Amino acid sequence: MISLSYFNDYGSFDFYLMPYFIERVFPGTKGRPRLAFEVDKNNVIFESSSKKNKVDVAIRYSTVIDDFDIGISHFYGNNRSPNLTFNNKSFKLDQYYPILSQTSLDLQSTKGAWLYKLEALLADNGGEKHFSIAGGTEYTIYGVRETSSDLGIVIEYTFDDRNDFAFNDEGVIALRWTQNDINSKSILAGLLSDLGGNSNRFFAEFEQRLNDDVKLFIDTSISGNIDQNDFT
């Protein structure tokens, strides 16, 4: 990858050139977790005639206006996530990498103990257009019970106009605890609920630095109910 950054009074510009594409690696028959069928790594199709040799490009502009951090990005190149199609002859999943053209916007503002965030994305994935948006707020209680710990209350909403998977219209409520110690110990736990159906899921994340070079992450997810009309 080749990157170039330019800064001026109006903000910063970042340019990226990615001259060689690396296919996504999927778990084999003995790998976990994996899909119900094996992904055929020998049957890969690209929309681009240049295939792996296509030069992908990306650009990002970011600036600060008053209390708002603003970023605008665009990417054009091979999609990093292939479309998987079942092959009736091999009983495996064939890979197809379409050309992805997507533009995104991100906003963030901090006002006292309140943090506000908004992200929006418009993409054309091999001719299939879709839109997604995510926004939310977090209120932080500093120095809980006169300690160094902070407690954040998180509320988020996300929407994706693709209806072929679960949690495409969801609300999230969570608590974030941060100890603010030398090990950067923190816990995030909450409930995710599909507002367009009956699906819900509990999640928890724990992280702690073990030493200067090693950090521990533990993620847990428990599905309470998955709507029969959702694909996961």
Regions found by a protein language model. Name each.
Residues 8-10, 17-23, 65, 76-80, ...:
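Transmembrane beta-strands of outer-membrane beta-barrel pores
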Residues 1, 26-32, 82-90, 128-132, ...:
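Outer-membrane beta-barrel translocator domains and adjoining extracellular loop/strand segments
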Residues 2-6, 59-63, 105-109, 135-139, ...:
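Residues on the lipid-exposed face of transmembrane beta-strands in outer-membrane beta-barrel proteins
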Residues 7, 53-57, 99-103, 110, ...:
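Residues that define the transmembrane beta-barrel architecture of outer-membrane proteins
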Residues 13-15, 70-72, 116-118, 149-155, ...:
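Transmembrane beta-strands of outer-membrane beta-barrel proteins
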Residues 1-59, 232:
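Surface-exposed coil loops of outer-membrane beta-barrel proteins
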Residues 1, 152-172, 193, 199, ...:
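Outer-membrane beta-barrel translocator/channel fold
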Residues 10-12, 64-67, 127, 142-151, ...:
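Short loop/turn motifs that connect adjacent beta-strands in outer-membrane beta-barrel proteins
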